[in-house]
């Protein structure tokens, strides 16, 4: 009985997840007594090894909103196939609201050429050589969601070969 911990939930194990806050906004809700202020945090969570997620958290204080955003991001993780050259297998396109994102693979040494929240999503996914362009809306949340949709649409060469029911060696031959 003496070795029991008082609250085992507070012990957090060390993880390799990284989180970056894309935006913190003060939002208000009009109630009978006036305006109720709270904070909305958009957070991108990733392990830089092919897993990434975007979360939104709202709370009365900034720290609480970020914490909720991280939890929400971990609930909405996607797997991203990354090639040996730390790029993506093929060009892809995603939409989130009025935001459209185009992502293309790039040669080794190119780096992440992208702007805003799309850059954050790609970096935390572990993609090192990629070109991306935001089209339409510049809303950070919709652009992050569009980037996630684009990355979720990626398929590996193995998946394409299985879909076509041919060996992977015959994928390129005519």
UniProtKB/Swiss-Prot annotation:
Question: What InterPro entries has UniProt attached to this entry?
Answer: Ribosomal_Su5_D2-typ_SF, Ribosomal_uS5, Ribosomal_uS5_bac-type, Ribosomal_uS5_C, Ribosomal_uS5_N, Ribosomal_uS5_N_CS, Ribsml_uS5_D2-typ_fold_subgr
CC per GO annotation: small ribosomal subunit
Enumerate the GO terms in the molecular function aspect. Answer: rRNA binding; structural constituent of ribosome
Which residue ranges does the record assign to the S5 DRBM domain?
17-80
The record ties this protein, via Pfam families, to:
Ribosomal_S5, Ribosomal_S5_C
GO BP terms: namely:
translation
Keywords recorded for this protein, A-Z: Ribonucleoprotein, Ribosomal protein, RNA-binding, rRNA-binding
Q: What is known of its domains?
A: The N-terminal domain interacts with the head of the 30S subunit; the C-terminal domain interacts with the body and contacts protein S4. The interaction surface between S4 and S5 is involved in control of translational fidelity.
State its role.
Answer: With S4 and S12 plays an important role in translational accuracy. Located at the back of the 30S subunit body where it stabilizes the conformation of the head with respect to the body.
| Family to which this protein belongs | Belongs to the universal ribosomal protein uS5 family.
The record's annotation in PANTHER family points to: MITOCHONDRIAL RIBOSOMAL PROTEIN S5 (PTHR48277:SF1)
What interactions and quaternary structure are annotated? Part of the 30S ribosomal subunit. Contacts proteins S4 and S8.
Q: Please report the name of this protein according to its UniProt entry.
A: Small ribosomal subunit protein uS5
Name its species.
Answer: Thermosynechococcus vestitus (strain NIES-2133 / IAM M-273 / BP-1)
Q: Supply the gene name.
A: rpsE
């Amino acid at each position: 009985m003496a070795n029991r911990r008082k609250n085992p939930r507070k012990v957090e194990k060390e993880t390799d997840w990284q989180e970056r806050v894309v935006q913190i906004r003060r939002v208000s809700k009009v109630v009978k007594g006036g305006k109720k202020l709270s904070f909305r945090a958009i957070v991108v969570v990733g392990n830089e090894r092919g897993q990434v997620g975007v979360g939104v958290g709202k709370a009365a204080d900034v720290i609480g909103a970020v914490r909720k955003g991280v939890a929400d991001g971990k609930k909405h993780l996607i797997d991203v196939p990354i090639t040996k050259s730390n790029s993506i297998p093929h060009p892809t396109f995603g939409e989130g609201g009025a935001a459209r994102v185009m992502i293309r693979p790039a040669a080794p040494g190119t780096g992440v050429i992208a702007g805003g929240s799309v850059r954050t999503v790609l970096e935390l996914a572990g993609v090192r050589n990629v070109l991306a362009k935001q089209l339409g809306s510049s809303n950070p949340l919709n652009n992050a969601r569009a980037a996630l949709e684009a990355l979720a649409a990626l398929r590996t060469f193995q998946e394409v070969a299985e879909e076509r029911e041919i060996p992977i060696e015959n994928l390129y031959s005519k």
